[in-house]
């Protein structure tokens, strides 16, 4: 079984949202407050989050990795159901690498209307870059 290792990088801030990588955990911050942690245990990917103010449910989250070759989704660190093994990252000019972990969540604690944000984390074994929609 192949595994994906996250490289520790400095948090990147997008509209008061930042993302930090520590070992096998992805930690999301909102205005410097932790809003959730994505981590792996016993082969499962789990998301923990709560509102730091109300201590109640704070986010709806979906996350997956997408194979750039066939576009299929698969859970970290499993392969997509089309490929036998996760192929090594292949750089192709403007393509950062082959896999994207997408984290999408909705902020229901905003004083304004509910806001849904997405962060895409482009992953290979040596480099992580992020962007947001």
Swiss-Prot record:
Question: Which domain of life, per UniProt?
Answer: Viruses
Which family, according to the similarity comment?
Belongs to the mimivirus L15/L51/R83 family.
Specify the protein name.
Answer: Uncharacterized protein R83
Q: What is the lineage of its organism?
A: Viruses, Varidnaviria, Bamfordvirae, Nucleocytoviricota, Megaviricetes
């Amino acid at each position: 079984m192949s595994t994906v290792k996250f490289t520790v990088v400095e948090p990147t801030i997008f509209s008061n949202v930042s993302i930090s990588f520590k070992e096998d955990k992805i930690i999301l911050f909102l205005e410097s407050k932790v809003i959730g942690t994505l981590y792996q245990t016993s082969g499962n990917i789990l998301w923990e989050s709560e509102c730091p103010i109300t201590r109640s449910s704070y986010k709806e989250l979906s996350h997956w990795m997408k194979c750039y070759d066939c576009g299929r989704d698969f859970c970290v660190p499993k392969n997509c159901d089309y490929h036998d093994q996760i192929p090594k990252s292949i750089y192709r000019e403007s393509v950062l690498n082959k896999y994207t972990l997408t984290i999408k969540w909705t902020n229901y604690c905003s004083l304004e209307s509910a806001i849904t944000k997405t962060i895409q984390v482009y992953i290979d074994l040596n480099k992580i870059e992020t962007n947001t929609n």
